[in-house]
Regions:
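Residues lining the SAM
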Residues: 116-120, 148
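N-terminal, positively charged/glycine-rich alpha-helical extensions of SAM-dependent methyltransferases
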Residues: 1-15
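A short glycine-rich, Lys/Arg-flanked "PGG" loop and its adjoining helix->strand segment in the class I
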Residues: 129-141
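A short acidic, Gly/Pro-enriched loop at the edge of an enzyme's catalytic core
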Residues: 106-114
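Conserved alpha-helix/loop element of class I SAM-dependent methyltransferases that forms part
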Residues: 24-42
Length: 246
């Protein structure tokens, strides 16, 4: 059985425990921030799916005073901790919190980017496409999605390496062994190629990996531009080619 993220005990231990479980946890968020900075405007609006206790929110808020965020999470306990964290750093005016799934948001394409970090591997396989579709539908035509999840892996050497990494990060040998034993119970993983195809079938394009540590993989997926936007872009290119500018 997966952990109960509505449990106060689980949530209180989450921030410390996640750094032991996920190799390169902090470097991951540095990568995400660097990529977002390279593509977003200073006034971007970002959707964070499964905001958890608010670590990625805090990290991004401290660096980007003009970005706005909408943060959703189905765990009220997680959400309350994230709200307190954001309030404590004086950034509540930049964040709208929503208790629930992405489907609880208004059905409008208003986000420049969406983050789904360590979330989709908890979603049942038959619900994954709907999960990504809800995100896709709420992105602007030029929006992008960034994900990071555990992939299906059958390579025993990678499992051994993961145990060594987690033990180096602070888990005991017994905890590492239990972690490996529980992977199939706690996660609904798919292979790298299946994950990529899932995003493409949802409607995303230019789907590629931006990060990997063992069986953890991060994807960037760009929303496919609408025909109207593509036609406008083509028109602008043609006008520029003929020396006409608006």
């Amino acid at each position: 059985m997966a952990k109960d993220f509505n449990s106060s005990k689980v949530v209180d231990e989450y921030d410390q425990h996640i750094r032991k479980l996920i190799p390169g946890y902090e470097m991951l968020h540095q990568q995400v921030d660097a990529i977002l900075q390279s593509v977003l405007s200073p006034k971007a609006h970002i959707l964070i799916v499964g905001c958890g206790t608010g670590y990625e929110l805090e990290y991004l808020l401290k660096k980007h005073p003009d970005w706005m965020f909408t943060a959703v999470d189905p765990s009220a306990t997680m959400l309350q901790k994230a709200q307190k964290l954001v309030s404590d750093i004086g950034k509540s005016d930049q964040v709208s919190f929503v208790h629930g799934e992405t489907s609880a948001l208004a059905d409008q394409a208003c986000f420049d980017a969406a983050l789904s970090i360590l979330v989709a591997h908890f979603i049942a396989d038959d619900s994954k496409k709907a999960f990504f579709q809800e995100i896709y539908d709420r992105l602007k035509d030029t929006g992008l999605l960034m994900t990071y999840d555990l992939m299906t892996c059958t390579d025993s050497q990678q499992f051994q390496a993961l145990q060594h990494l987690c033990q180096h990060n602070g888990l005991t040998s017994t905890q590492c062994q239990k972690m490996i034993e529980r992977l199939h119970q706690d996660f609904s993983t798919v292979r790298f190629d299946e994950y990529q195809q899932l995003l493409l079938k949802t409607g995303f394009e230019h789907v590629y990996s931006y990060s990997q540590i063992l069986m953890y993989q991060g994807f960037i997926a760009h929303k496919k531009q609408s025909n109207a936007l593509v036609m406008q872009d083509s028109k602008n290119v043609a006008l520029t080619h003929h020396g006409i500018k608006h």
